[in-house]
């Protein structure tokens, strides 16, 4: 089967410089969702028709299995499909999809394709309570489809029809090519409508078959930011329902956003207002607190991420604790039972098994061993304005509060670092390191008093 995806429209009502089909749904372009659905049908040819913002669209979805046809002028859906014909296999039927209709299920399309075998012309229709704005399916008294009429060209009687055309069709390609070549544009829009092919197919003796999706939202398209927001909520609720069915506990299914792939083990619990981006894995027994953002991360069994924490490109070990208000940046690796607490930032650094940094700390470009206690206010000074350097802290080190490690520096196993110390030289194992300081107390000091105006 050939699949053609129409993605050339300008999307004026989006009021955006970004081509409509590149606006994100669940963190990915609308068009990418449609391409993924098409791929699931294993087409022999997959062609995307581009026009407005053509090079931007091409760059966003380019792949070895995707071919592109260009519609230089947007002269209607029939004209758009015509641009793809040279790239199609004429011996295979062609399925036409739309780059701004992202939620159609693969099973729905397969059902349509199966119904349209043996030289039938298949149309996906849906019945709406309010069909305003859509082309109507006109049938004769026997229930056979006789034509599809667009809203602007419909008579008052036709406007009362509630079965509408979704635009998604399957047709025999060789005949489709002939029918498209014979299309005219004598209509209110002055465009070449793909829907007008139906009358030609009927005249040629082809049976018009229709199928409907299981859910009306499968055929909803995007023409405005309001419609995009509506589809986002529908899609996110579908994802939430799938998580619930898999045994994940969601504090509120309406308040989770998945913008990528979220894989969960058993007994995972997710509180409200959490966002998951990219590929995220939550193993058995993981708990995610409220208002967390987790991107491209793997969190091992029994770990806990407390509220308002941000994880990006991080790996969290079994039974580790993160947050609240912690930030793990790319390259952060927490071993089993490690703790990273409030207002701690970890970047391109490892924190060994059972090690803890519970308060107000920056650990960047560091290798920290097991059972290390990092006191509040500790900073690894890893950047000299041009280059990054690493700090190495071996097992069983105790770091007092308000400590700075000026990299490159290595602190040996079992070292104790006194509070307020700046460490700029390597320290051998089991040493106490501190900076000599004097403390002076003066009597008779009078604190300045602000003058009253």
Curated annotation (Swiss-Prot):
Residues 247-453 are annotated as: N-acetyltransferase. Residues 226-246 are annotated as: Linker. It holds the Pfam family NTP_transf_3. Pathway: Nucleotide-sugar biosynthesis; UDP-N-acetyl-alpha-D-glucosamine biosynthesis; N-acetyl-alpha-D-glucosamine 1-phosphate from alpha-D-glucosamine 6-phosphate (route II): step 2/2; Nucleotide-sugar biosynthesis; UDP-N-acetyl-alpha-D-glucosamine biosynthesis; UDP-N-acetyl-alpha-D-glucosamine from N-acetyl-alpha-D-glucosamine 1-phosphate: step 1/1; Bacterial outer membrane biogenesis; LPS lipid A biosynthesis. SUPFAM superfamilies: Nucleotide-diphospho-sugar transferases, Trimeric LpxA-like enzymes. Keywords: Acyltransferase, Cell shape, Cell wall biogenesis/degradation, Cytoplasm, Magnesium, Metal-binding, Multifunctional enzyme, Nucleotidyltransferase, Peptidoglycan synthesis, Repeat, Transferase. GO terms for molecular function: glucosamine-1-phosphate N-acetyltransferase activity; magnesium ion binding; UDP-N-acetylglucosamine diphosphorylase activity. InterPro entries: Bifunctional_GlmU (IPR005882), GlmU-like (IPR050065), GlmU_C_LbH (IPR038009), Hexapep (IPR001451), MobA-like_NTP_Trfase (IPR025877), Nucleotide-diphossugar_trans (IPR029044), Trimer_LpxA-like_sf (IPR011004). The keyword Cell inner membrane does not apply. Acetyl-CoA binds at residues 376, 382-383, 401, 419. One of its GO terms (biological process) is UDP-N-acetylglucosamine biosynthetic process. Gene3D superfamilies: Hexapeptide repeat proteins, Spore Coat Polysaccharide Biosynthesis Protein SpsA, Chain A. Its cofactor is Mg(2+). GO terms for cellular component: cytoplasm; membrane. UDP-N-acetyl-alpha-D-glucosamine binds at residues 6-9, 20, 71, 76-77, 98-100, 135, 150, 165, 223, 329, 347, 362, 373. Its EC number is 2.7.7.23, 2.3.1.157. It catalyses: alpha-D-glucosamine 1-phosphate + acetyl-CoA = N-acetyl-alpha-D-glucosamine 1-phosphate + CoA + H(+); N-acetyl-alpha-D-glucosamine 1-phosphate + UTP + H(+) = UDP-N-acetyl-alpha-D-glucosamine + diphosphate. Mg(2+) binds at residues 100, 223. It is found in: Cytoplasm. Its main location: cytoplasm. Catalyzes the last two sequential reactions in the de novo biosynthetic pathway for UDP-N-acetylglucosamine (UDP-GlcNAc). The C-terminal domain catalyzes the transfer of acetyl group from acetyl coenzyme A to glucosamine-1-phosphate (GlcN-1-P) to produce N-acetylglucosamine-1-phosphate (GlcNAc-1-P), which is converted into UDP-GlcNAc by the transfer of uridine 5-monophosphate (from uridine 5-triphosphate), a reaction catalyzed by the N-terminal domain. This is Bifunctional protein GlmU.
């Amino acid at each position: 089967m050939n699949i053609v995806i129409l993605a050339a429209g300008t999307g004026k009502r989006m009021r955006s410089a970004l081509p409509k089909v590149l606006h994100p749904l669940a963190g990915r372009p609308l068009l990418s969702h449609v391409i993924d659905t098409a791929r699931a049908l294993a087409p022999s040819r997959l062609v995307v028709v581009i026009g407005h913002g053509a090079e931007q669209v091409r760059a966003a979805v380019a792949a070895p299995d995707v071919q592109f046809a260009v519609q230089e002028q947007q002269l209607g859906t029939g004209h758009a499909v015509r641009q793809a014909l040279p790239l199609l296999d004429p011996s295979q039927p062609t399925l036409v999809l739309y780059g701004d209709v992202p939620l159609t299920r693969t099973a729905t399309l397969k059902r349509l394709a199966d119904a349209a075998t043996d030289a039938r012309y298949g149309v996906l229709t849906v019945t709406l309570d309010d069909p305003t704005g859509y082309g109507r399916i006109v049938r004769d008294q026997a229930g056979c489809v006789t034509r599809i009429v667009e809203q602007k060209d419909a008579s008052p009687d036709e406007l009362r029809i509630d079965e509408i055309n979704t635009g998604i069709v399957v047709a025999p390609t060789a005949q489709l090519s002939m029918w498209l070549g014979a299309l005219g544009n004598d209509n209110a829009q002055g465009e070449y409508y793909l829907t007008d092919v139906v009358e030609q197919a009927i005249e040629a003796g082809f049976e018009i078959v229709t199928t409907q999706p299981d859910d009306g939202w499968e055929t909803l398209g995007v023409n405005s930011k309001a419609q995009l927001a509506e589809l986002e909520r529908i899609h996110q609720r579908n994802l939430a329902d799938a998580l619930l069915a898999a045994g994940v506990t969601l504090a509120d299914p309406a308040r989770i956003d998945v913008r990528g792939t979220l894989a969960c083990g058993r007994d995972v619990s997710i509180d409200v207002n959490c966002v998951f981006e990219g590929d995220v894995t939550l193993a058995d027994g993981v708990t995610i607190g409220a208002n967390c953002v987790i991107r491209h991360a793997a969190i091992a069994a029994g770990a806990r991420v407390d509220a308002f924490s941000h994880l990006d490109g991080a790996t969290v070990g079994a039974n580790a604790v993160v947050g609240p208000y912690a930030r793990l940046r790319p390259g952060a690796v927490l071993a089993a039972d490690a703790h990273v607490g409030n207002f701690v930032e970890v970047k391109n650094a490892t924190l060994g098994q059972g090690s803890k940094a519970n308060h107000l700390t920056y650990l960047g470009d560091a290798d920290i061993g097991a059972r290390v206690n990092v006191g509040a206010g500790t900073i690894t000074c890893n950047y000299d304005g041009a280059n990054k350097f690493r700090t190495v802290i071996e097992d069983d080190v105790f770091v007092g509060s308000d400590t700075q490690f000026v990299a490159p520096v290595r602190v040996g196993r079992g070292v104790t670092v006194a509070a307020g110390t700046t460490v700029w030289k390597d320290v051998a194992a089991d040493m106490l390191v501190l900076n000599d300081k004097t403390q002076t107390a003066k009597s008779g000091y009078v604190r300045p008093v602000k003058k009253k105006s």
